[in-house]
Each structure stands twice: as C-alpha cells, then as structure tokens.
C-alpha cells in the first residue's frame, strides 16, 4: 500500500504498508464482522508524524474546507512539522517490500501489557534496485524473489515501560529502544509462489484489513486506533459496494487450490 491519496507508481517515493491476516484464530474479537481472523497492520516508518487524532481531523478539515496555512501553523506550534519534513527527506526507493522494516506505529494490548509491533526482514535473498525504476518495479522484484526463494521476517514487540515517554495517544513519538528493548515473538514465512494471477488479485481485492480484527487480548488501543477501526470499516463497505461485492471473511480453504 501507499500513503498518497492518489494511486502512484512504485517509482514514486512513498510510505509503504504491510498487512498480515492470521486465519483460524478462535476467541472473542473486538469487531464482529470477522470471527476467525487476527490482523496486523504496519508501515515502513516507526512514527505517524501528525501523531494525534485531533491533528488528523484538523488535517482533513483545513486541507479540504478551510485554509491549509492554518493547519501548517498548528503543526509548527506543536512540533510536528519538522517530523513531517524529516520523514519526506528520508524517503527512498526501496528495493522490495520484502526487504523493508515495518512498524505498527500505534499501540496494542498484549495480555496485560501495552506494545507496538515491529517486522524485520531476515531473508537470505535480497533484491537489487533496478537501473530503470518502472511504475511496477516493486511488484516485479517481489515476484522475482518469491519465484525461487521464500521470504522471512522476525515479528517483534516493544513493551511500553513509561506511559509518559511512550504515550498511547501520540503516534509521532518514538518509543526509545534503549528503555524498552524489542523482543522477538514469532517468525513470518512467505513461501515460494506465483502471486501475480487474476485469482489472487481478486482474492486480495475482496479482503479487508482492520486493527479491529483482533482478539480482545491483542485489542488496539488509543484514540487513533479507535478512529481507524471505524474508518476502515466504512472504507471497506464503500469499496465492496463499488465493486458489487459482499463483505468477505477468508478461510483456509480459499488458499488450498488458488492459482
């Protein structure tokens, strides 16, 4: 995925997303629209520079219905503008989505602890940046990787140890790893496969991801996550309605014979 409101090619620098959907997950869920899944949503930056729900609201309001300069002033006063500029400055062309670190940026429960998630690539095979950056080079590099090699990641958590220095309602603040080390809890393996097929693209288009697709024990917390759950649900309904498709929860059988 990308963060730009308009779809752009892979040759445009942007924030990239990574979503994981576990199947066959039994237990009480935060949202009732999927009963057997657990989703993890991450992006390739460890913060959301705007940070707070109020500023996200103001961003939409001032950029669409009022004067964007007012919002720029608000960002400057609250110290967010420099974070946005630094993020833009540090954007680069990635070699492949399978070679990138990803972060949840927002917090979740982990039993009685509050954590953030981190995904670190560990594959032996690494893609190379092509000389000609086409609009589909990331997809092509990912497909070339998975044709002959599996992709692997370490899935880690970072536990909140100080609620003032590691707030739940400001995603622009980095949780200091010197004060809370990251801990590996799982390995993610993506097997050798051909994913660029009509059937797989159709399945992907029918899927919905949300922080709310979660066990209560791993529920999303904080203002931003609360808003995301509601917004993602409405966006999914809108997208499925536009495609004349019903909302759909996948199961293991969807992947047994897919081409």
Regions found by a protein language model. Give the residues of each.
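Active-site-adjacent core segments of small-molecule enzymes
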Residues: 1-259
């Amino acid at each position: 995925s990308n963060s730009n409101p308009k779809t752009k090619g892979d040759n445009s620098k942007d924030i990239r997303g990574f979503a994981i959907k576990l199947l066959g997950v039994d237990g009480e869920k935060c949202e009732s629209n999927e009963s057997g899944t657990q989703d993890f949503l991450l992006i390739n930056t460890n913060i959301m520079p705007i940070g707070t729900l109020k500023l996200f609201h103001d961003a939409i309001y001032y950029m669409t219905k009022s004067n964007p300069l007012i919002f720029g002033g608000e960002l400057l006063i609250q110290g967010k503008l420099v974070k946005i500029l630094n993020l833009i400055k540090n954007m680069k062309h990635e070699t492949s989505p399978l070679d990138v670190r990803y972060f949840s940026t927002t917090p979740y429960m982990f039993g009685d602890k509050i954590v953030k998630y981190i995904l670190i690539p560990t594959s032996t095979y690494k893609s190379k940046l092509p000389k000609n950056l086409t609009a589909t080079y990331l997809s092509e590099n990912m497909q070339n990787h998975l044709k002959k090699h599996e992709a692997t990641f370490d899935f880690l958590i970072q536990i909140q140890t100080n609620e003032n220095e590691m707030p739940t309602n400001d995603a622009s603040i980095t949780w200091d790893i010197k004060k809370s080390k990251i801990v590996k809890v799982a390995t993610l393996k993506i097997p050798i496969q051909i994913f660029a097929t009509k059937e797989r693209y159709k399945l992907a288009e029918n899927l919905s991801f949300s922080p709310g697709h979660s066990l209560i024990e791993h529920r999303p917390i904080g203002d931003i996550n609360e808003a995301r759950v509601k917004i993602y649900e409405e966006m999914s309904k809108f997208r499925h309605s536009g495609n004349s498709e019903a909302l759909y929860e996948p199961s293991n059988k969807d992947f047994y014979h897919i081409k």
